């Protein structure tokens, strides 16, 4: 009984943390979808919607035991040739749930590759802002062909709070 009482608060905390993470993710994705697909639009153009299943992060600090495969679920929606909005959730390099909400601005193009920045907010990194939301602006390059695309993002290291990496995000769309 004494062991149960010692661990019960931790279990309650972890359960609460998990539920808050799920609620936060649902709220972020719901807000994103409302903005993109509100009734102000007569029709949703699926050729502008890209879906991804997370990231692969090639970390600079290979000896830290970080998670390179970062599975998740996200959406990216093109507003025009330069602007896109994005939202999603993934398991980050610290093996925690992270959410993101942001926008891509890619004004330059070199051949088939668009170049610019992605800015927004992230959460879920225990050493960065106690796991809370924080802003980020990151350089990004994107390649798209038909129904397949790839975003490559440089994530700079942030002292002992966030580990640096080159992040690869494979994306798909349902319609050309």
Name the predicted role of every residue range:
Residues 53, 73-77, 87, 101-106, ...:
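Residues on the lipid-exposed face of transmembrane beta-strands in outer-membrane beta-barrel proteins
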Residues 50, 55-59, 163-176:
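Outer-membrane beta-barrel "beta-signal"
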Residues 1-46:
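Cleavable N-terminal export/targeting peptides
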